């Protein structure tokens, strides 16, 4: 690996965990996936470690989501809704509500728009985003602009109780 792994870890780990959290919606699982991606980087010694880590981590999260979907189809016990826990503070409820609206708004985006937005939010450059998504570098700015606009529209619609079409 051309760059020092400790330095890459120091500068990339938190962004990678945030990126993964927005894919798996579980903080502990996001950290586990980030650590696994770094472990794989030690073995593979990629030329561009930062971009490689995000690509590998995204693939691991995608594989895990597919595996989980298969398990849910086969295990009827998982169809039960988990019970909500009561929170004592109105601020905590508001924050949770905002997180749920952001998550719902993200899910209304097309997979491509969501991926580009999350990669950008994680700190990847336009070149790194283009390499991972297969989009032309020049299309990244347009895609980001559209994704941001649609995210805001979906978030605001969620706040007012409206429905926004997916994609």
Regions found by a protein language model. Give the residues of each.
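Internal acidic/polar
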Residues: 72-95, 99, 125-126
């Amino acid at each position: 690996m051309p760059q020092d792994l400790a330095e890459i870890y120091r500068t990339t780990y938190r962004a990678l965990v945030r990126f993964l959290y927005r894919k798996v919606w579980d903080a502990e699982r996001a950290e586990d996936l980030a650590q696994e991606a770094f472990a794989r980087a030690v073995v593979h010694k990629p030329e561009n470690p930062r971009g490689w880590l995000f690509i590998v981590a995204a693939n691991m999260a995608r594989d895990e989501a597919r595996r989980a979907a298969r398990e849910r189809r086969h295990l009827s016990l998982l169809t039960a809704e988990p019970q909500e826990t009561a929170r004592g503070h109105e601020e905590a409820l508001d924050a949770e509500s905002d997180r749920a609206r952001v998550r719902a708004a993200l899910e209304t985006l097309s997979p491509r728009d969501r991926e580009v937005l999350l990669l950008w939010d994680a700190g990847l450059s336009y070149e790194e985003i283009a390499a991972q998504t297969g989009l032309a570098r020049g299309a990244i700015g347009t895609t980001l602009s559209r994704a941001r606009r649609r995210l805001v529209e979906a978030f605001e619609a969620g706040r007012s109780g409206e429905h926004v079409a997916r994609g």
